[in-house]
């Protein structure tokens, strides 16, 4: 293979790159609207209702300037009725769901302890989290707390809109190295990254161009079947292969040695586990046994029959049922509702057949109805098509002194088309 053929094949490879760039330019110029939020609705209801049960979540402040700090705090309960179809949280990582890195995460704490690598969490227990963020990209962004569970995937919590003002060009993220030098990680070694991208892409384009310029699959297959592979092996192919192999090894070795000399003090990627004890179990005088549950499809209502016992010394009243980040409340729950909680996740359709307080030592049957269009808007009615048709959530009650008691409830649910 002569120099002309080699040049021809390289040029044809560049043509392929030009076509790809043209296709990319067309996608950029087309008027395509971006997806802003609510991707969590695509998750299966059994993951959102019966795995991580979020509560007391706060986002703040609502408006943040570039380079200013924000925070997401809250708690979550790992449901006792964890579905068999999902891997258990033996290896979990607390994360933040956002549309690209619009914030920089400064720190994460679980129960007051740093949490920067994965670790085990205990089913049936509660955890408190705090995530500190720094505003990076201006805009209106939908932010979620999120728990990534190995083999189960990300489990997103409720989301709220957080606004960032200012200019992206003003963002800086200074970090102090072990050598005492301070760098801006937003722009540090940007030219170096571009250089290596260009180097490896150029080698790849040249390699592809060499072999795509010649006859492709069918002609080569016919030659191979008729005459063997000797005719397909060009001496120049072997030379090019050796040159690129040696060049690749030299670049890898040289780049490694250069990096070692320029940055002698490095911290390797951590491979351990974060182990944090769960929150202490709070005394709860309320016990609940689910006896029946159904979902009214046309009425968009979950109806649950339960047997409730108050083992305490103070009357208690139910006021909230929260599931998948949706808070169903009645007049009692409204008194304790956080006014900053996203309005699109609040439903006032929580009713009990007996709204009176449960007296100390009393056991009675209650029928709860959680009714709202949010069942369909949030795509939770799809639980009827899950491999385990079961519901789950947190039922909250308050006593006369304002103390809150939280019960995680779950049970099988059947669809109905008339009120039973």
From Swiss-Prot:
The keyword Cytoplasm applies. Gene3D superfamilies: Helix hairpin bin (1.10.287.710), Particulate methane monooxygenase, b subunit. Chain: A, domain 1 (2.60.120.570), Particulate methane monooxygenase, b subunit. Chain: A, domain 3 (2.60.40.1580). One of its GO terms (cellular component) is cytoplasm. Its EC number is 1.14.99.39. InterPro entries: NH3_CH4_mOase_B (IPR006833), NH3_CH4_mOase_suB_C (IPR023303), NH3_CH4_mOase_suB_hlx_hairpin (IPR023141), NH3_CH4_mOase_suB_N (IPR023301). Disulfide bonds: none annotated. It is found in: Cell membrane; Cytoplasm. The keyword Endoplasmic reticulum does not apply. Residues 1-25 form the signal peptide. It comes from the Bacteria. Coiled coil: none annotated. Keywords: Cell membrane, Copper, Cytoplasm, Membrane, Metal-binding, Monooxygenase, Oxidoreductase, Signal, Transmembrane, Transmembrane helix. Cu cation 2 binds at residues 142, 144. It is a multi-pass membrane protein. Disruption phenotype: Cells lacking amoB1 grow more slowly than wild-type cells, while cells lacking amoB2 grow at rates similar to wild-type. In vitro, inhibited by acetylene. The soluble ammonia monooxygenase is a nonamer composed of three alpha subunits (AmoA), three beta subunits (AmoB) and three gamma subunits (Cytochrome c1 PetC). Part of the ammonia monooxygenase complex, which catalyzes the oxidation of ammonia to hydroxylamine, the first reaction in the process of ammonia oxidation to nitrite. This is Ammonia monooxygenase beta subunit. It comes from Nitrosomonas europaea (strain ATCC 19718 / CIP 103999 / KCTC 2705 / NBRC 14298). The gene is amoB1.
